[in-house]
């Protein structure tokens, strides 16, 4: 308690005695005078007002909403190829946020949410596309791995943990989080294991799909603020998922067989040979349809709540070569920037680029593998250069080969 030697009560903030102020408010371990209480109230109101203003400043504006062509052009700066997927994403994202900003016209026409599912091999750019769109729109964005999700009551993460991560990214600003984007990766890993029910519980398959339904369709979900399992003493935060855009991605390994079976069934009969001749058997993914996802193991309710289905082409050698150097944030440009920060000009022999791409193709690593290869090549020089008085450094083909031969290539193959 703030008391003087003569037992006079004093304000714990300004130190004035009870005779020098209008009145004192008694707390558990001290006092506060009327003047300090007024100042504290004004400071609190000012801080809360600034918070609301900053939160409102990040909200989307229909006039500032980028058009589909502008969205695609922005994606082109960071992602090589995949034009079809970019067009699907650009239109879907534009319509989604236009739907959020629509005014009540009173005509009873309600535009439904268009969640997206992207199908493509590992390293083709699914995650990068979603992340780049969130960067353009300046909305909260989070990535969730579907493989760690389990039904409530089992070891693993609850479905609600998806929204916990989005809230954390938005600094617990609920209105802002409710306009965010969630990317659910490896959605194919929660496919139903088979058509026949098993005596063992499929806690990370169909049960998780059922749990995702309420998030995808739009409902108010009580979210534990710190994640983890719910318990009675934990205060929940209600989050409305109606305006959250969900983008799902998965490799769907083996789905080409499902597509081929469907196409073979459909082309049997009159004029079948002509139709079969037009099918590109090297890229069956381009013919994917919702029924193929159902055959793979996604339940119809989930497929219905992911109405926008697009695919990503496998990356050929030319695409990998472009990805290595052309995007704004390409791995080569990142290393050049890192060396610049140490005052060193970094260059590569042109043959090094071709060698890196050859290895990525050889080990079937995709675009993600390019980084693994470059980091393996550059590790030693990145360790030594900051301690040396050197202004220029050129990576030669011989040096690149030596570094990769010295490394454990089997480790790269599973990167």
From Swiss-Prot:
Gene3D superfamilies: 1.10.8.60, ClpX chaperone, C4-type zinc finger domain, P-loop containing nucleotide triphosphate hydrolases. One of its GO terms (biological process) is proteolysis involved in protein catabolic process. The keyword ATP-binding applies. One of its GO terms (cellular component) is HslUV protease complex. Zn(2+) binds at residues 11, 14, 33, 36. GO terms for molecular function: ATP binding; ATP hydrolysis activity; ATP-dependent protein folding chaperone; protein dimerization activity; unfolded protein binding; zinc ion binding. Belongs to the ClpX chaperone family. This is ATP-dependent Clp protease ATP-binding subunit ClpX. The lineage of its organism: Bacteria, Pseudomonadati, Bacteroidota, Bacteroidia, Bacteroidales.
């Amino acid at each position: 308690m703030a008391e003087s030697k003569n037992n006079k009560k004093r304000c714990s903030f300004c130190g004035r005695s009870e005779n020098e102020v209008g009145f004192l408010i008694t707390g558990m371990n001290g006092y506060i005078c009327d003047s300090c209480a007024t100042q504290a109230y004004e400071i609190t109101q000012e801080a809360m007002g600034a918070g609301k203003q900053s939160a409102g400043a990040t909200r989307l504006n229909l006039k500032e909403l980028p058009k589909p062509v502008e969205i695609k052009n922005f994606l082109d700066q960071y992602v090589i190829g995949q034009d079809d997927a970019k067009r699907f994403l650009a239109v879907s994202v534009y319509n989604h946020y236009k739907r959020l900003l629509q005014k009540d016209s009173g005509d009873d026409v309600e535009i439904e949410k268009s969640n997206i599912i992207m199908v493509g091999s590992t390293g083709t750019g699914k995650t990068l596309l979603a992340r780049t769109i969130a960067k353009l729109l300046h909305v909260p964005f989070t990535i969730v791995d579907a493989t760690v999700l389990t039904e409530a009551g089992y070891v693993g993460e609850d479905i609600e943990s998806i929204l916990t991560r989005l809230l954390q990214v938005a600094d617990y600003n609920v209105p802002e989080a409710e306009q965010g984007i969630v990317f659910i990766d490896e959605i194919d890993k929660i496919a139903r294991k088979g058509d026949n029910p098993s005596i063992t519980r499929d806690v990370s398959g169909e049960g998780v799909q059922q749990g995702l339904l309420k998030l995808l369709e739009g409902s108010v979900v009580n979210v534990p603020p710190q994640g983890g399992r719910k318990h009675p003493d934990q205060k929940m935060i209600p989050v409305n998922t109606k305006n959250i855009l969900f983008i799902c991605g998965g490799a769907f390994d083996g789905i080409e067989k499902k597509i081929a079976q469907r196409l073979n069934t459909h082309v049997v009969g009159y004029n079948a040979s002509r139709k079969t001749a037009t099918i590109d058997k090297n890229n069956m993914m381009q013919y994917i349809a919702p029924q193929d996802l159902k055959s793979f193991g996604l339940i119809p309710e989930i497929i219905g709540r992911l109405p926008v289905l697009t695919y990503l082409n496998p990356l050929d050698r030319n695409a990998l070569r472009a990805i290595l150097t052309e995007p704004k944030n390409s791995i080569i440009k990142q290393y050049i920037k890192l060396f610049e920060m140490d005052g060193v000009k970094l260059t590569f022999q042109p043959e090094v680029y071709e060698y890196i791409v050859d290895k990525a193709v050889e080990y079937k690593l995709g675009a993600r593998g390019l980084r693994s290869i470059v980091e393996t090549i550059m590790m030693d020089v990145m360790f030594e250069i900051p301690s040396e008085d050197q202004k220029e450094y050129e990576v030669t083909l011989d040096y690149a080969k030596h570094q990769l031969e010295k490394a454990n290539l089997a480790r790269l193959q599973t990167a």
